[in-house]
A protein has these predicted regions:
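Serine/threonine-rich, low-complexity intrinsically disordered segments
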Residues: 5-6, 28
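Residue-level detector of alpha-helix boundary/anchor positions
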Residues: 6-8, 18
Length: 238
């Protein structure tokens, strides 16, 4: 267990968390018994920055200092035209001009859903720091120049796979993907251009909630709401 947990978080279940078959194999885990106590820190209105973007940057700096794995991983939730939600993990690639950037295939399920309804919810979970950040906002594509510039920084394999993968489509087997990758490599070599169906989005927040775990489940929840060019801050009951 990492020292950052200081013995308070039960990430590894004990024997009592499992039932066993006669031969000693683990049969199932009693998920309801997995609990943890939140003890690390608090978040008061006096501590919070008036600007939620600056508050996010503060917390993100804490994450980087803690050397957490995949610090920029976030859940991205979208909704279909029929109102069916879907979610997946993507990577934050920048915070600029008050918006949050990520890149993907525009023809993927998330791309198609964002085309129909340009709204999304982002969620960061930093368990080791007992923190979450939820961001609700509208979405727009970044410029082609911005997408070109970021695409050029990606490793060669990642650039080629953007051509090889028709993201979210059904394929017969992995060999189909490997053949498509070889075809992209043969066609473009070491200098693949950016596919027109691949690029970035920016999420422009309308609400940002900061959640800090506290003892006895009396968690701190501060909600920022955009009001014109300013932000209001409200405390939510846990």
């Amino acid at each position: 267990m990492s020292t950052i947990f200081r013995g308070r978080l039960r990430w590894f279940p004990s024997q009592s968390d499992f039932s066993h078959a006669p031969d000693g194999r683990i049969n199932r885990m009693n998920i309801a018994d997995l609990r943890q106590e939140y003890m690390r820190a608090g978040l008061t209105e006096a501590q919070a920055d008036a600007d939620p973007i600056r508050q996010f940057e503060r917390w993100f700096d804490d994450v980087l200092r803690a050397r957490l794995p995949l610090p920029n991983a976030m859940s991205l939730a979208t909704v279909s035209a029929e109102g069916a939600p879907s979610a997946r993990i993507v990577l934050l690639k920048g915070v600029e001009r008050g918006s949050f950037l990520f890149y993907t295939n525009y023809l993927s399920r998330k791309g198609r859903e964002l085309e129909r309804r340009a709204a999304a919810c982002l969620l960061f979970l930093w368990s080791e720091l007992e923190r979450q950040v939820r961001i609700d906002g509208t979405v727009e594509k970044v410029t082609t120049g911005e997408s070109d510039a970021y695409y050029a920084t990606r490793p060669l394999g990642a650039r080629l796979s953007a051509w090889a993968s028709a993201q979210s489509d059904i394929v017969g087997d992995r060999k189909v993907l490997e053949n498509a990758m070889e075809e992209a490599r043969r066609r473009y070599g070491d200098h693949p251009p950016r596919p027109p169906h691949w690029g970035g989005y920016r999420v422009m927040p309308q609400e940002i909630e900061f959640w800090q775990g506290r003892s006895d489940r009396l968690h701190d929840r501060l909600l920022y709401r955009r009001k014109g060019s300013a932000w209001t801050i409200e405390r939510l009951s846990p």
